[in-house]
Amino acid sequence: MAGNDCAIIDVGGQDTKVILVEQGMIQDFLMNDKCSAGTGKFLEIMANRLGVTIEELFELASQGNAVSISSLCTVFAESEVISMIGEGRSREDIAAGVVHSVAEKVAQLARRKQLPGTVILTGGLSECPYFAEILSEKLECNVSAMRDGRYAGALGAALLAREKTK
């Protein structure tokens, strides 16, 4: 996947994980599962509020100038988005603000550890190149999205099962 030393950032619908790998072995693991603000679920809720799909949210975001979404709680952030819509802010700017907000939340978790030179993005958001781009900016390093990254956990489990049955 990424050689012997890397950080894997897995952003799924329910949680976000940062996994540090040294010499091919997991050395450290962080997870945010207490709040949906840094997950795909947050993006799904905000996309619904804007009346678009997640794919359309990223398309809009790539065309906008990010507005600040200050709330860390999904419910309060949703209220902020509703207010911005009412104020006539563009969907592009709101979408960009939403994506930047999630990327910052993920970056805050990742910054709790010293990241090696190679950072791999897995989970459902690995299929969104714009998210990897924004996360790269937030972390000030290159974040590469894994091909078929949404299946990384399942692929790893299958490889482990195959190894155990040999």
PLM region spans:
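Adenine-nucleotide phosphate-binding core of ATP-dependent small-molecule kinases
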Residues: 77-111, 150
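Active-site nucleophile and cofactor-binding loops and adjacent substrate-binding regions
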Residues: 9-13, 31-38, 97-99, 125, ...
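Glycine-rich phosphate-binding/hydrolytic loop that grips phosphoryl groups
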Residues: 1-2, 40-44, 146-166
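Gly/Thr-rich phosphate-binding beta-strand-loop-beta motif of the actin/hexokinase/Hsp70
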Residues: 5-24
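Glycine-rich phosphate-binding loops at beta-strand->alpha-helix junctions
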Residues: 110-138, 149-153
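Short, surface-exposed connector motifs at secondary-structure boundaries
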Residues: 2, 25, 90, 112-118, ...
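Glycine-rich phosphate-binding loop plus the immediately following alpha-helix
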Residues: 5, 23-69, 159
